A protein has these predicted regions:
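Divalent metal-coordination and catalytic microenvironments
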Residues: 4, 20, 30, 81-82
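Fold-independent oxyanion-binding glycine-rich loops
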Residues: 7-9, 31-32, 105, 131
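Active-site environment of divalent metal-dependent phosphoester hydrolases
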Residues: 13-14, 84-87, 110, 135
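Pre-active-site segment of Zn-dependent metallo-hydrolases
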Residues: 25-78, 92, 99, 103, ...
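Histidine-centered divalent metal-coordination motifs
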Residues: 76, 80-86
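Short acidic-hydrophobic, aromatic-tinged amphipathic segments that line or gate anion-handling sites
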Residues: 124-131
């Protein structure tokens, strides 16, 4: 059975995140930030470590706690393109999932640049696909 979870970005520009579940496996499309809310949250303080739960409260990143029950089912995080409203939350939220990050060369290079600039280390593998290619993530997906 196919299930779609509208996690974020459906009522605004930002925090884009959708989970598509097929049987007992799922993929997450996008993990973006809401730029205005992120700036409001971070502008007044020198933050040493940004806490994901605080970013959720500030409305800056998708509320992934809504899909906590699916955490172990998510097999891949796939940012659809390199805009921050589609991949900007990956540095803060992706470590909560045991899933590879899969994207095109441009998208993964933008993500790597953000991670390097912000000195963030992810546990997730970043895989680069050629444009217009296909990739089998799991048995169902």
């Amino acid at each position: 059975m196919l299930e779609i979870y509208a996690v974020g970005g459906y009522n605004e520009v930002g925090k884009n995140c959708t989970v598509i579940k097929v049987d007992d496996e799922a993929v997450m499309l996008d993990m973006g930030v809401h730029i205005e809310n992120y700036i409001k949250y971070t502008q007044d303080e020198e933050l040493i470590a940004v806490k994901p739960s605080e970013l959720v409260k500030a409305g800056a990143v998708p509320d992934i706690y809504f899909i906590e029950k699916l955490k172990d089912n998510i097999k891949a995080i796939i940012p659809t393109h390199a805009h921050l409203d589609h991949l900007g939350a990956i540095p803060y939220l992706s470590n909560k999932f045991k899933a590879d990050i899969i994207g095109t060369a441009y998208t993964t290079e933008v993500l790597r640049a953000i991670l390097k600039n912000d000195k963030i280390k992810l546990n997730n593998k970043i895989k680069t696909l050629s444009a217009n290619s296909s990739f089998k993530i799991s048995n169902n997906i």
